[in-house]
Every structure is written in C-alpha cells, then in structure tokens.
Amino acid sequence: MTADISLRPADHPAVKSGKVGVLLVNLGTPDGTDYTSMRRYLREFLTDRRVIEWSRWKWYPILFGIVLNRRPQKVGRAYELIWNKEKNESFLRTYTRNQSELMAERLKDLDNVKVDWAMRYGTPSIASRIEALKQEGCDRIVLFPLYPQYAAATTATVNDKAFHKLLSMRWQPALRTVPDYHDDETYIDALAQSVEKHLSSLDWKPDMLIASFHGIPMSYFKQGDPYYCQCQKTGRLLRERLGLTQENFMVTFQSRFGPEEWLQPYTDKTVEKLARDGVKRIAVINPGFVSDCLETLEEIAEQAAHSFHENGGEKFAHIPCLNDSEDGMKVLEKVVRRELQGWV
C-alpha cells in the first residue's frame, strides 16, 4: 500500500515509502584470506553467543588466547584453495549476490518489491542493508535466512541481528521472518534432480550416497533445537524421492569444532570407515547449504575426498549445492513469494 501523496501538506519533506524489501542472508565470509581479515571475521563469528554457548569467562580466554592467534592463518590457507580468484572473493559471496540479482529479476512483476542481500558475519552487514532498504522506501521487509533447516546458531542469530538493528530505528519497518523449508516438495525435488544430473555425468555408480549436514553440539539438540530432526527428515525425503534404501544412503554431520560431542555420525569418520570397510565408490551432497562455501568446497570436495582415497576408496564425487542454478532459484522464489502474501 502506497501513501496518498496528495494528502501531504505542501511543505512535507520527501519520504519514500510503500515498498516491500526482501533481504537474503547467509552466514558470512571474510573480506580476504590474509591474517587480519580472517581474524576479524572469526572474532565476530566466534563471539556470537548463539554459536558458542559457553560462559564468557570460560570461552574468551581460549578464544582470545589461543583460537584467534592460531586459526586465522590455518583457515586463511583453506580459503585460498577455494577462493574465487576472478572476483577476489569467496564463492559464498559470489553466489549470494547472484541469488539476490536473479531473485530481483524473477520478481520484476511485483513493482513495489526490492531485493537485497547481507551476511550475518562480515559485509555487507544485516544492519546496513535493513537501513538501505528503509531508505529506499521499504516499510515492510521479508527477512530470509538462507538455511533450509532451522538452528539457533544459524536462523535465530540472523533474526537476533535484524531485530537488534530495529532497536536503533525511529521509524521501524515491519519485519517478517521466513521459517525453515526442510520438507518443502520443491526443495526436495531440486536436491533429487541435482543428484540425478550429477551422477548421470559419471561413468560409475556410487555404492553409497551421503547427505552431509553442518553439525551442532549435541547439547544444543538436547536443549530443544529442532535441527537434527529436520536434517533427518530432509535426508529421508531425499532418499525416498531417489528410490534409495538405507543400505545405500545415510545422513552425517560435519564441521565439528572444539571438544564437545556433536551430532553424529561424523562425516569425516564415516567416509574413512566406509573406505576401510571396502566401499569403493561414494558420492556426497550437502543439502543444508544453499551455496557452496568453505565447508563444501574444501572440507568435503578436498579433505573428505583425500581421506576416502587414502583409506582405500577409489571413486569420490561431490555434488554441488543448488547455488544460483535454475532449480535452486525456483526453491528460493517459491519461499519468497509465499512469504510475500498479504504484502503485495
């Protein structure tokens, strides 16, 4: 709904309003692979209480005394392996920007909708893009955390950051948060089609298809986080859609950090065990990642593949994320159009 300009007094200042914003938000990325950029990014990420729930007195001495002195260099080297050299940025940034631009094109039938993108950690920040959308006249914003499965450490922290920005705004836009879509039919179909397309390009058939999701500490799950259950359901629906059995499909969890027990089975240990048990050919897909990033391109496509081959495996395939593909954009567009109902 657009305000009737004719009703404004003659001396009324120019004010843009009546538009609806769509803000796509992913996890984040460092600005570069150098030590300073990596440390700045890791500090913002690892001081988030949604990510690390330890008490500050316990966690900060470890973080500032050890982690932020050692890990920036190590993680920076990993990023260098998968850095988008052409654009001098991470592929996560490239894909998220592309998704935003493609979404704007797909929604061009809606005159009053503006699409933008942000990162929870790093740049562009959520706060800066909410401010920009408001300045463009968006008095309503659909906040879309790009996570098919809900977790407090991902979706909730995006919502936290957005609402924290509203605390500083005199004229707040209405904010609508997008729920998870872990069992959405279009999403499951897109994953299945991606698997079928990629495997059809190989001259071999995998003995096992692994759906590897980012892990979270087991304690988070026990406190009520629905993430594990949603990952399992996504995996089951994908397996059924592909017509596979539990003997040739499994769900695993990757990227654990620190000494705590995380969701299991662990992807790295599973890949190693499968190879040692005589499984020769496997394929891995990452259904929980909307875009390829460090955890998929380096941790799975490089590290997991190397481990599999080192322990006796012969053939390893990593199935790309949906990224900015046509099928991937259909999923995102469906979710956005659903959440725009009543506003456009």
Curated annotation (Swiss-Prot):
Protein origin, superkingdom: Bacteria
Record field: catalytic activity: heme b + 2 H(+) = protoporphyrin IX + Fe(2+)
Pathway connected to this protein: Porphyrin-containing compound metabolism; protoheme biosynthesis; protoheme from protoporphyrin-IX: step 1/1
Cellular compartments per GO CC: cytoplasm
Main subcellular localisation: cytoplasm
GO molecular function, one term: metal ion binding
GO terms of biological process kind: heme biosynthetic process
Tagged with keyword Lyase: yes
A Pfam family hit: Ferrochelatase
Record keywords, A-Z: Cytoplasm, Heme biosynthesis, Iron, Lyase, Metal-binding, Porphyrin biosynthesis
Xref: InterPro entries: Ferrochelatase, Ferrochelatase_AS, Ferrochelatase_C, Ferrochelatase_N
Residues that hold Fe cation according to the record: 214, 295
Database matches in PANTHER family: FERROCHELATASE, FERROCHELATASE, MITOCHONDRIAL
UniProt-recorded name of the protein: Ferrochelatase
Organism expressing this protein natively: Rhizobium etli (strain CIAT 652)
